[in-house]
Amino acid sequence: QVHGVRLRDGRADWYRNRYVVSDRVAEATGRPTTPGPRFHDSEGTANTNVIGHAGMTLAVVEAGGPVMSLTDDLDTVESIDFNGTLDGSFSAHPKVDPITGELHVAAYHWTWDFIRYLVVNAEGTAVTRKVDVPVGYSPMVHDIHITESSVLLLDFPCRFNLERAMEGHQLPYVWVDDEPGSVGVLPLDGTSDDVRW
């Protein structure tokens, strides 16, 4: 569910809350499914964050999809994949480059043994860059940071745990005390070989 307050002339014009109508929400509530593309891990709920990019209001989730487009009144319009260029997980906390307007993303999924760095163009029409940075396990990557020349990939010891998944835990990630945390510095135009940990 998303909540919003529209401010106008120093006053609250309205308060609204709406369900983001992903496939899972449509099924649970008996609503029609939202139009738009689907991919293998777009079964999520788009319930973690709301961001603005390229004039769009987007509801996003960690470790999967979908990316849902919303109206200014918070109604769900459609799921999007940036015109077929997003083929897997997105992120709940991407960052907009204040100079280029591009959206920088650190994505992860429980089946991946890498962190996926994505760039969505300033127009919001395409993923223009994808770099898979191997880490050898399935990390939980909550955030990303950018500088003028680099992206900072945060790899802390919160890892997917198959045993917890098999036990039915909805969030099958665990903190591994004896593993160090790392910050990877990737040049904005670099490859996975250029990451410095």
Residue ranges and their predicted role:
Residues 141-143, 147-157, 164, 174-176, ...:
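Extended catalytic-interface subdomain
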